[in-house]
From Swiss-Prot:
Function: Part of the ABC transporter complex MetNIQ involved in methionine import. Responsible for energy coupling to the transport system.
Localisation per UniProt entry: Cell membrane
Gene that encodes it: metN2
Organism: Bacillus thuringiensis subsp. konkukian (strain 97-27)
This protein's UniProt keywords: Amino-acid transport, ATP-binding, Cell membrane, Membrane, Nucleotide-binding, Translocase, Transport
Subunit and interaction comment: The complex is composed of two ATP-binding proteins (MetN), two transmembrane proteins (MetI) and a solute-binding protein (MetQ).
Lineage, uppermost ranks: Bacteria, Bacillati, Bacillota, Bacilli, Bacillales
Gene3D superfamilies to which the protein is assigned, alphabetical: 3.30.70.260, P-loop containing nucleotide triphosphate hydrolases
Descriptive protein name: Methionine import ATP-binding protein MetN 2
Length: 341
């Protein structure tokens, strides 16, 4: 569906060339929700703007739906852009137009007749949950409602691809989840390919099928979200995963608890997919002559399945503890010893 081959974007500056995107290679499948995550300055905003040619690549090739979009210009590019919708962090609405008129705007530009425009706007207002707000102006809307207008406007021309540029960064956590649920629903209903960029791992976890991690203009890691959670390869990816699995408060709590358990071993168990539902600790206590104390635990749901971790204290004879650890490995649960007694 979307293919990036050796794509590079270089900006000219007085201080010298700035490489915002450095030889990016990506393949995004039709109908998937693909996330790009990175900290500020990583190059993710420049990357997503290459998809619809708001930015032109310095080199490389971008193909969307079998069309080399990086090689077209003029009316052909304008037509191609109608098949690529985009929503923004700060909504980019026309403040002098109502909700209906904002959604209708791209249809006007495309030359759609008035009756067809009215019908399409009605459909979109229903799709994004803005019934009764069609005559309101942006200044009368909440942040979440403004983004719903942005989504409806982006879908007006029935695009194949929806680009989301930090679409939830200006929203509170509850509204963020509502917008993410809406995007997930639209993806399922319409079979729409969604590409989103964010600096929040929560967004990736909640709705993305796969993720690419960017750092200093380079794509340093890609993969299914659950695989990245389970086994992050790069230091930056590990930091993003720790946003959800290990907060500073959690680490401080574990450290203080470890001091209370000078004997035995403190281990971290990681559960992926079906392993989350296995009674691992129950089996452990049934077959081992050791004491098991749960110090901390959490479970996160990704779009590919569940991911969980437990920090537990194992106390008993060294031989019994080692046998227990071997039994945990047999249950296909990853284990890391984080403190020895």
């Amino acid at each position: 569906m979307i293919l990036l081959e050796n794509v590079k974007k270089i900006y000219k500056a007085k201080s010298g060339d700035v490489t915002a995107v450095d030889n990016a290679n990506l393949k995004i499948d039709k109908g998937e929700i693909f996330g790009v995550i990175g900290y500020s300055g990583a190059g993710k905003s420049s990357l997503i703007r290459l998809f619809n040619q708001l930015e032109k690549p310095t080199s490389g090739q971008i193909t969307i739906a079998n069309r080399v979009i990086s090689a077209i210009t003029g009316s052909e590019l304008r037509k191609a852009r109608q098949e690529i919708g985009m929503i923004f962090q700060h909504f980019n609405l026309l403040w002098s137009r109502t909700v209906r008129e904002n959604i209708e705007f791209p249809l006007e530009i495309a030359g759609v007749d008035k009756a067809a425009r009215r019908k399409r706007v009605d459909e979109l207002i229903h799709l994004v949950g803005l019934e009764g707000r069609g005559d309101a102006y942006p200044s009368q809307l909440s942040g979440g409602q403004k983004q719903r207008v942005g989504i409806a406007r982006a879908l007006a021309n029935n695009p194949q691809v929806l680009l989301c540029d930090e679409a939830t960064s200006a929203l509170d956590p509850e509204t963020t989840d509502q917008i993410l649920d809406l995007l997930l629903d639209i993806n399922k209903r319409l079979g729409l390919t969604i590409v989103l960029i964010t600096h929040e791992m929560h967004v990736i976890r909640k709705i993305c099928n796969r993720v690419a991690v960017m750092e200093k203009g380079k794509i340093v890691e890609t993969g299914p979200v659950l695989d990245v959670f389970r086994n992050p390869q790069q230091d930056i990816t590990k930091r993003f995963v720790q946003q959800l699995t290990d907060s500073e408060d959690t680490n401080e709590t574990i450290e203080s608890l470890i001091e209370k358990y000078p004997d035995g071993k403190v281990v971290r168990l990681q559960f992926i997919g079906e392993a989350v539902e296995r009674p691992v600790l129950q089996r452990l206590m049934q077959r081992s002559d050791i004491e098991v104390s749960i110090l901390q635990g959490n479970i996160a749901q990704t779009n590919n399945g569940s991911y969980g971790s437990l920090v537990v204290h194992l106390n008993g004879e060294e031989t019994a503890i080692q046998q227990a650890i071997e039994g945990i490995h047999q249950d296909q649960v990853e284990l890391e010893v984080i403190a020895h007694g």
